[in-house]
A protein has these predicted regions:
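C-terminal and inter-domain tail/linker signature
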Residues: 1-168
Length: 168
């Protein structure tokens, strides 16, 4: 039996998440996995990512670093309680040595509001012994937060002009 390539392993994991396959974490991750969603709450010691803002974390409390399989399982369960992936586009996985990256988009419905959002993503992977050891997920958090926004408008000042994003 041939072993999976890194690209195949990553594609299989992402497919399992869409199916809400609860056994995926045990099959695809190293026991000491570092699973980062959009950044950490504190500065990255390696300087690769800035910390996420307190406002962003308040809006989307599942962001941050989840260490170990149990923490990843809790994150995924929390995510699945709050949103339903309703569609996804083509995915590209690039792999070299023990590192890989995946790029694509998905559409989800926020279960609390019924709103949908389409979100592009990029994921950086590090693999060890055929398992995912580091997973760094980046997405458009503004679109995600907007789908969960239950009321109120956003007032923005860009390019010297004020803009209002109404509640939908």
């Amino acid at each position: 039996m041939r072993s999976q390539s890194n690209s195949e392993l990553i594609a299989a994991y992402l497919d399992a998440v869409i199916r809400k396959d609860a056994s995926a974490v045990d099959r695809f991750f190293a026991p000491d996995v570092e699973y980062m969603v959009n950044g950490a709450l504190t500065p990255d010691p390696e300087g690769k990512l800035p910390p996420i803002s307190a406002d962003c974390y308040m809006a989307l409390p599942w962001l941050g670093v989840h260490k170990g399989k149990e923490a990843v399982k809790e994150f995924l369960a929390h995510m699945h309680r709050n949103l339903e992936v309703t569609a996804h586009g083509p995915r590209e996985v690039i792999s070299q040595g023990n590192r890989a990256a995946a790029f694509g988009w998905f559409r989800f419905q926020a279960l609390s509001t019924g709103r949908t959002a389409e979100v592009a993503y990029a994921i950086r992977f590090e693999l060890r012994n055929g398992l995912i050891a580091r997973y760094h997920f980046l997405e458009n958090t503004l679109n995600v937060a907007a789908a969960f926004r239950s009321s109120g408008e956003w007032s923005l000042n860009t390019d010297g002009a004020k803009h209002t994003v109404p509640s939908q």
